[in-house]
UniProtKB/Swiss-Prot annotation:
Homodimer. This is NH(3)-dependent NAD(+) synthetase. Its EC number is 6.3.1.5. Pfam families: NAD_synthase (PF02540). HAMAP family: NadE_ammonia_dep (MF_00193). GO terms for biological process: NAD biosynthetic process.
Length: 284
C-alpha cells in the first residue's frame, strides 16, 4: 500500500473510532461523566454495573461511572454503581484488583467466582462430544468462555438492579479487535470510546489513580496455560505504536500495516450480526 493510501486509511479509521485530534483530560472526564449520567436518567435506569479486573481500563471506566451516579444523586435522582469482582478461582493479581477498587470507590462491590460456571460449560461441551486439536486450543476456548460468563454475571446484576452494563472498550483495543465477542465486548454503554490507551492513562491520572495502577501492563488474562500474558505479546506491537497510528503521528510503515491487518481481520467484532443485505462479501 502506498504511503498516501495508508495515511488516508489511518485518518478514516481514526474518524470511525471517534479519536479526536486534541485531548484535554479534564474536559474528557466531564464529557464522559455527563454522558453516563444523562444516559441513565433519560432511560429511567438506576444502576451501572462493571467488572473491575485490576487493570487501568476497568478502573477508569468504573471511576467515571461512580462519579456519574454521585452526580445524579446530588440532583435528586437515585442511582448506584455496582462494581463486580469476577475472578476465575484465585486471581493472580489480587493486589492490583484491590488497588483498583480503592481508586474506584464503588457504592457496592459484589464478588462472583466464574470458575464453577466456566468449568461446567467446558465439561458439558466435552460430554456432548466436542474435541479439540490440542490443549492450547482448549485453553483458548475456555478463555472465551470465562469472558462470556463474566458478561452473563454482569447482565444478571444489571437486570436485578434496573441498570446497564458498562464496557471498557476504547479506540486502541477496538482497532485491534482485542476483546471477546459477546464477552467483554458485550455492554450497553462505553464511556472510554474514542480514547487511545495513553489517553485512558492520562484520564486515570487526572482522576487520582496511582502510578502502579496507571502503568500496569495490560493483559486480558484469559489463558490458563499463559497466565498474565501481556496484550502487546498478542499484537506483536506496542500500545504506544497503536496510539500513534490512531493519533496520526509519524510511524514505521510496517507497524501501520500490522494495525491495518488486525483492523481488517476483526471487522466482524465491531459490527452487529450480519444479514445477506449488509455483509460486504455478498451482493444483496
Amino acid at each position: 500500500m502506498s504511503r498516501p493510501d495508508q495515511a488516508a486509511r489511518r485518518r478514516a479509521i481514526a474518524a470511525e473510532l471517534h479519536v479526536s485530534p486534541t485531548f484535554d483530560a479534564r474536559d474528557e472526564a466531564e464529557r464522559r461523566i455527563g454522558f453516563v449520567a444523562d444516559y441513565l436518567r433519560t432511560a429511567g435506569l438506576r444502576a451501572c454495573v462493571l467488572g473491575i479486573s485490576g487493570g487501568i481500563d476497568s478502573s477508569t471506566a468504573g471511576r467515571l461511572a461512580q462519579l456519574a451516579v454521585e452526580r445524579l444523586r446530588a440532583s435528586g435522582y437515585d442511582a448506584r454503581f455496582v462494581a463486580m469482582r469476577l475472578p476465575y478461582g484465585a486471581q493472580h493479581d489480587e493486589a492490583d484488583a484491590r488497588r483498583a477498587l480503592a481508586f474506584v470507590r464503588a457504592d457496592e462491590t459484589l464478588t462472583v467466582d466464574v470458575k464453577p460456571a466456566a468449568d461446567a460449560m467446558l465439561a458439558a461441551l466435552a460430554a456432548g462430544g466436542l474435541a479439540y486439536l490440542d490443549h492450547a486450543q482448549q485453553d483458548f476456548v475456555l478463555g472465551n468462555i470465562k469472558a462470556r460468563e463474566r458478561m452473563i454475571a454482569q447482565y444478571a446484576v444489571a437486570g436485578a438492579r434496573n441498570g446497564v452494563v458498562i464496557g471498557t472498550d476504547h479506540a486502541a483495543e477496538s482497532v485491534m479487535g482485542f476483546f471477546t465477542k459477546f464477552g467483554d465486548g458485550g455492554a450497553d454503554v462505553l464511556p472510554l470510546a474514542g480514547l487511545t490507551k495513553r489517553r485512558v492513562r492520562a484520564l486515570a491520572r487526572m482522576l487520582g489513580a496511582d502510578e502502579p495502577l496507571v502503568l500496569k501492563t495490560p493483559t486480558a488474562d484469559l489463558e490458563t496455560l499463559r497466565p498474565q500474558r501481556p496484550d502487546e505479546h498478542a499484537y506483536g506491537i506496542t500500545y504506544e505504536q497503536i496510539d500513534d497510528f490512531l493519533e496520526g503521528k509519524p510511524m514505521d510503515d510496517a507497524v501501520a500495516e500490522t494495525v491495518l491487518r488486525f483492523y481488517d481481520a476483526t471487522h466482524h467484532k465491531r459490527a452487529l450480526p450480519y444479514t445477506m443485505f449488509d455483509w460486504p462479501g455478498h451482493p444483496a
